[in-house]
Amino acid sequence: MHAISSAAPAPSVRLPFYRQLYFQVVFAIIIGVLLGHFQPEYGAAMKPFGDAFIKLIKMIIAPVIFLTIVTGIASMSHLSAVGRVFGKAMAYFLTFSTLALVVGLVVANVMQPGTGMHINVAELDQTAVKGYVSKSHEMTLTGFALDIIPKTLISPFVGDNILQVLLVAVLFGVSLAMVGDAGKPILDFLDGLTKPVFKLVNIVMKAAPIGAFGAMAFTIGKFGLGSLVNLAELVLTFYITSAVFVLVVLGAVARACGFSVLKLIRYLKAELLLVLGTSSSESALPSLMEKMEKAGCSKSVVGLVVPTGYSFNLDGTNIYMTLAALFIAQATDTHLTLGHQIALLLVAMLSSKGAAGVTGAGFITLAATLAVVPEVPVAGMALILGVDRFMSECRSLTNFIGNAVATVVVSRWENALDADRLHRVLDGEAEFLPEPERAVEPVVLARHRA
C-alpha cells in the first residue's frame, strides 16, 4: 500500500490567463459564433474541426476507462468493495435520475410552455424526425442489456460503447485481484501505462479550442442566431429548470457532503466550456476522471462511478425528456391524465438509461419514450427539432455536473475521499498541491484522516 506524501509541494507559477484552457475555449467559442453569424457558409464548413476533436476524444476514452478501473479494482484490499461502490452508485443514480424526471414533469405542468400553440399534428412535416424514430425502435430494454456484452474482449476498444469497456475492465480487474501476487507484474505494467495515457489526454485537450470553434461555428452557421430565440419559452424554461436543479438539488446534496457545488463548477470550468462548445459531455470524460482524482476522490471510485454515470446518471437528459414530452402534448392539445403522466415517467426511467453522452442521444431517447406512450404524438417532435440542438448544450452541461457531484458523494459514502485535499483544490490551490498517489486505496485514505 502507498502512503500519501507529506512533503511540501514545490511552488508553481500560475499560467497567464491567455494560456489557460478555459480562456482559450471561451475565445474560440466567441470566434466561432461570429464566423457562423457573419459568414454562415464558412461557419458551416468548420464542422470537420469539431468532428475531428470528438474523434480524438473517443480514441482515448476506452484506454482511460480500462486502465483506471483495472488498476483501481486490482489495488483494492477487498473485492467486496467493488460491489459496494457499484451498489451505492446505482442507488444514487436511480434516486436523482428519477428526481430529475419528476422536476421536468412538475415544471411543465406549472409553466405550460406549449399551451396556446394549437398545432395540428397532421400538418407537421414528419420527415425530419423519421431517422430518430427508427433509431428509437432499436432501443429496447433487452437489446440494451445484451448490447453491454461485447462479442470479444477486444471489440469494446474498437467500438464506442462505454458500458462494454466498463464490463471488460471490471471483470479483468476482479480477475487480476483474485490471482494475487501472480498478477503483480501485470498490475505494475498497467499502472505504468496509465501515466503516458493521461499525458496523451493532456496533449489532446490542447486541441479543445479548435474543436469548440469548429462545433460552434457550424451550429450558428447551419441554424443561425435566429434559431436561438425560436420557441424561446421552451428553451428558457429548460435552462432555468436545469440551473435550479443544479444549484438547489445538487447544491443541497453537495452541502450535505461538505462541499460547494459552485466551487466544484469553478474547478471544472474549462471542461464545462468544452462541453458547451461541443455539445457533448463525452468530450470531457477523460479530463473529468483525471480532475476528480486530483480533487481527492479514490481512483477506484472514479473509475466505476464516472463511466457508469454517463449512461445511468443523465440528470439533464431526464429533465429534458419529461419537459419536452409535455410541451409536445400541450402544443398539440393532447390531454394527459395523471395516469398518463405517471406512465410517461415510468417509461422514461427505463429509456433514459440507454442514452449515451453524445450529441443527439437525448432526442433519440425522447423518440423511444414517446413511441411507448401512444397518447403523445411522436410527430410532434418536429416542433422542437429546430431548437433541440441548443437544448443539447444544457443537457450535456447538467449531465456533466451531475456526474461530478455523484463522484464526490459516492467517494464520501465510501470513506474514500481526501476531504482536506478536496477543499484545498476547490479553493483554488490545485497547482500548489503534489500529484495524488494514483495507486492509493480507499482504506488508506480513511486511515490517513483518522
Curated annotation (Swiss-Prot):
Pfam families: SDF
Transmembrane segments: 25-45, 56-76, 90-110, 162-182, 200-220, 234-254, 319-339, 367-387
Compartments, as annotated in UniProt: Cell inner membrane
Any one GO biological process: L-aspartate transmembrane transport
GO molecular function annotation: fumarate transmembrane transporter activity; malate:proton symporter activity; succinate transmembrane transporter activity
PROSITE patterns cross-referenced by the UniProt entry: NA_DICARBOXYL_SYMP_1, NA_DICARBOXYL_SYMP_2
Membrane topology: Multi-pass membrane protein
Homology family: Belongs to the dicarboxylate/amino acid:cation symporter (DAACS) (TC 2.A.23) family.
Protein name, UniProt field: C4-dicarboxylate transport protein
Higher taxonomy: Bacteria, Pseudomonadati, Pseudomonadota, Betaproteobacteria, Burkholderiales
